[in-house]
Amino acid sequence: MPKPIVAIIGRPNVGKSTLFNRITGGRVAIVEDTPGVTRDRLYRDAEWCGRQFTLVDTGGIATHQDDPLVARVRSQAEQALKEADVIIFLVDSRTGITADDEEIAALLRRSDRPVILVANKVEDFSDPTVTHEFYRLGLGDPVPISAAHGLNTGDLLDRVVELLPAVPAGEEGDALKVAIVGRPNVGKSSLVNRLLGEERVIVSDLPGTTRDAVDTYIRRGEREYILIDTAGMRRKSRITVPTERYSVLRALRAVERADVVLVILDGTEGVTEQDKKIAGYGHEKGKATIIVVNKWDLVPKDERTMDHYREAVRQELSFMAYAPVLFISALTGQRVDQVLMTIDAVGEAANRRVATGTLNAVVREAVLLTPPPSVKGQEVKIYYATQVKVKPPTFVFFTNRPEGVHFSYQRYLENQLRQAFGFEGTPIRLIFRRGRER
């Protein structure tokens, strides 16, 4: 079963993201002075005293603003309340109780979830009156902390652990991490929501609505996935807001920690230079990759349109011919069922190991069929090969002249391995080292 969920709830700018980062041990949520910078739910695993749980940083709940996203953020936070096993309600000890605090408290009192009231930004822990005001919220004893300095957060986590439900041993599966990347407004969040069957990620007509890399857990049958919905990646020259620049960096980091990368293209447009750069980043990091052409419902088409588009993708992204291409509509759900199945397939391919004996039988046959070209009149010999790692599958070939194996012959050997063992959706790495015949 999934880990228990602990949600941090509060109005904008009370320090939710700072606390989230403090507990999870790194700068995960974007922190700025702008109220409401966190607009989606961010998920990250945490541990305290041997107990593991998933921490959720929600967008700030504000009730008296004209921002069109406020209603959506509020809905997101309310959804987090439904999912959470424990709720941390964060208030600001400096500003005291506000109308938003009172409305959130009323919402929490109606909830059947255990709530820990936490007063953040406390400067003088020796002053017993610093939290007295918050008793009138009707949520028990406030816990004073300073998230920015890490003061008293240990006591808070002790309270959290006391309230966590027990997790049966051995029931937490290994979830496949899937980074969903692409230019702004190509439909990344819409695809996540379609896969989930609920609006978990804020979707808006405003480009760049998703500003963080948002982790979302889903389960299909016995398989678990973590979908990492990233901020749209623009060219560096177009990034002017500091928050957006940091979001793009986090999108790149999301690719680094992913098992599978979905590169989302806009089917109403061709493959752009930025699309190539985004896809290339996953390729360089050795990630299993799927090219997902979204908005296919909006494309005027005949019986050859899909083939023509696939050929164009293959031409523009020739460096990753191994990646399957899917044509979907996140809006209508067209062919979205293929996405998780393909994720499973490429994830398995990236983790595939080939027995040394089986591998060398294929290598011997390939070398007999097409021997490596000689270099300056000297014969190049391939003695044997072995697989040294997965994700991506990596093979070391031992030869008398490592520098003499031409890149075209390396490509030939790669094609032979793919023909024999599949590896659809994943890059494979070939390394050539000097060795002797066994």
UniProtKB/Swiss-Prot annotation:
One of its GO terms (biological process) is ribosome biogenesis. InterPro entries: AAA+_ATPase, G_ENGA, GTP-bd, GTPase_Der, KH_dom-like, KH_dom-like_a/b, P-loop_NTPase, Small_GTP-bd. PANTHER family: GTPASE DER (PTHR43834:SF6). Residues 4-168, 176-351 form the EngA-type G domain. Pfam families: KH_dom-like, MMR_HSR1. GO terms for molecular function: ATP hydrolysis activity; GTP binding; ribosome binding. Belongs to the TRAFAC class TrmE-Era-EngA-EngB-Septin-like GTPase superfamily. EngA (Der) GTPase family. This is GTPase Der. Disulfide bonds: none annotated.
